[in-house]
Amino acid sequence: MRSVELLSLAALGSLVAAAPAPSRVSDLTKRSSTCTFTAASQATESASGCSEIVLDNIEVPAGETLDLSDVDDGTTIVFEGTTTFGYKEWSGPLIRFGGKDITVKQNSGAVIDGEGSRWWDGEGTNGGKTKPKFMYAHSLEDSTITGLSIKNTPVQAISVQATNLYLIDITIDNSDGDDNGGHNTDGFDISESTGVYIRGATVKNQDDCIAINSGENIEFSGGTCSGGHGLSIGSVGGRDDNTVKNVTITDSTVTDSANGVRIKTVYDATGSVSEVTYSNIKLSGITDYGIVIEQDYENGSPTGTPTTGVPITDLTIDGVTGTVESDAVEVYILCGDGSCSDWTWEGVDITGGETSSKCENVPSGASC
């Protein structure tokens, strides 16, 4: 009887040993795979487990988001061919990314085309048709978006709320909107972020090339901006997060735009702007202001009356040079009493326009 029991146990052990390892091997095999999708729903629903996701000539249905915010950590996302979107009046976004250690890139010749002219009516987000935001780079951590070619977004292009995100060699071309009613087509809108590094961007649009509304440790370098509203901080104030700190905007050009360098804070709001540096910025064809810093914005427009609730401190303007149009203002500074301080102002040489007679409370060292 004892020998039978031993034989039974031995047989059981052999069966266990011979059984395949459970999910670990199959999971690892699946994780190492490249998944190619030709439909947005496939990518959204089946991306889990793919180490690389290839989006092959995706046509996103009207009113839907190409949602890649729930992919596995470490995933690489590749755009192939032309990505397009069906038409519907809605708020969007058309694309959403999220996750940790994510890489987003495209193959040669690919383009992400918003076909924004279907929505453009000259009003942007201020009225008319409801227009979808284009891309949300939200909840990304330790990630990179590189080499994307984006064309004709309905309104704002890339909204960033992230930690340690690199955006490298991004092209946003909304130049078709110049004559077709493009409006509020911001390039990069940054808020509630820590560590955002935008390098080598090319932006052609009808609004801010970059707008930093809140966040810290932000860099914009080697950028080329044209047609829009320039390199902007703000408007700061009136949001959940109203702190902008440690920003460097450097080695960039702004051409044929309303403004070159701009900082704006909200009338009667609270917050702070500190440790901001603009350096080696080249301007040409500026139509409104070469440099404009004002603490008077309300409902998206200047009031002419500055307030002190969002101080601008430790600001460096170094090597901002170039030309503005003859009816533009070279430099305009409108600060509240004592709310602009510790500024460094060097190598500013802007010519061709008018000198403002309306500057107020210009801090020591700056000139207006």
UniProtKB/Swiss-Prot annotation:
GO terms for molecular function: polygalacturonase activity. The active site is at 207 (proton donor), 229. Gene3D superfamilies: Single-stranded right-handed beta-helix, Pectin lyase-like. Its EC number is 3.2.1.15. SMART domains: PbH1 (SM00710). It catalyses: (1,4-alpha-D-galacturonosyl)n+m + H2O = (1,4-alpha-D-galacturonosyl)n + (1,4-alpha-D-galacturonosyl)m. It comes from the Eukaryota. This is Probable endopolygalacturonase A. It comes from Neosartorya fischeri (strain ATCC 1020 / DSM 3700 / CBS 544.65 / FGSC A1164 / JCM 1740 / NRRL 181 / WB 181) (Aspergillus fischerianus).
